[in-house]
Amino acid sequence: MIVMSCASRAERAADYNDRIVGTQKSIVDALVVMDSTFSDTNATKEWVDLNYADLQARVKRAILALDSIGPFQEDPSLQLSAKELFRSYEALVDFEYKKLVEIKLLPDVSVDMAIVDSNLAVQERIFMQSKIAQERFYKAQEEFGKKYNLEFE
């Protein structure tokens, strides 16, 4: 009976983790679409604006979803770590991605080496800040897994 209870608890912890990761995946999918939009030389202003608005909305919905998911059995550690990650995404989208949108929408004749350098610098900041935030989340996820006997691939 105890083994069954532990397995059930581990299964619930795995399901909880999967819900959070599914919410994160929604944001990542929108980031991929936005990055593709930046690469698309034929992207219209409307398409850029639409994808940017979708990205902003997904991040905000994900943050709200964490509140409805709640803590796992009174343990808020993974929820709080995910919220920190999603808030990092929110800051990147509201500031760094906004700069990339502004650059993307510049007329071709306005793009000079300074703009190109600025674009590359923003992309580098996004990469580094994302990496740091994701590493923090993965560490919290590993700790959560150890607590509830989960292994992550």
Protein language model annotation of sequence segments:
Residues E46-D54, Q79-E84, M113-E124:
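Short, charged, amphipathic alpha-helical segments
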Residues A13-G22, S77-S88:
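Short, charge/polar-rich alpha-helical segments
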Residues E102-E153:
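A charged, solvent-exposed segment within the mature domains of Sec-exported extracytoplasmic proteins
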Residues M1-S5:
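Sec-dependent bacterial lipoprotein signal peptides
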Residues C6-A53, A57, K147-E153:
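Immediate post-signal-peptide N-terminus of mature secreted/exported proteins
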Residues T23-S26, L50-R58, K83-E102:
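Amphipathic, heptad-repeat alpha-helices with coiled-coil/zipper character that mediate oligomerization
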Residues S36-D40, R61-E74, S110-L120:
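Short, charged/polar, low-complexity loop and linker segments
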Residues A62-E84, K99-K104:
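Short, solvent-exposed, charged loop/turn and helix-capping segments
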